[in-house]
């Protein structure tokens, strides 16, 4: 009886882990698609900043943080980290599942 209970508990736990991994992968994929679409709109408006000192500084800090974020990632999935700097006086930044981020220059300037 105990052996059957342990086997059942293991099966339930394993299926929960497998299901959550599949869900995380789907969520990350949907987020990546939405991120690409949103960045395309912003890029078409000429609002992506890749060359200013602010953008370079944000990317520098971001690149230093990624290894620590990878260590803390407990999803079992690798993230494809991306950040885009948006030229705007707005005080804003946002992140999406799977390591997609946007940072507005207004937070730094």
Each model region followed by its residue ranges:
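C-terminal motif of bacterial Sec signal peptides marking the signal peptidase cleavage site
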Residues: 16-20
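Bacterial N-terminal signal peptides that target proteins for export
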Residues: 1-9
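Peri-catalytic and regulatory segments of divalent metal-dependent proteins
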Residues: 22-109
């Amino acid at each position: 009886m105990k052996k059957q209970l342990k086997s059942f508990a293991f099966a339930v736990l394993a299926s929960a882990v497998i299901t959550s991994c599949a869900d995380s992968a789907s969520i990350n994929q949907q987020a990546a698609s939405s991120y690409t679409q949103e960045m395309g709109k912003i890029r078409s408006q000429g609002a992506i900043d890749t060359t200013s000192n602010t953008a370079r500084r944000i990317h520098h800090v971001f690149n230093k943080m990624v290894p620590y974020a990878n260590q803390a990632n407990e999803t079992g999935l690798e993230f494809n980290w991306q950040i885009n700097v948006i030229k705007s006086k707005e005080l804003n930044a946002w992140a999406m599942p799977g390591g997609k981020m946007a940072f507005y220059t207004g937070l730094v300037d």
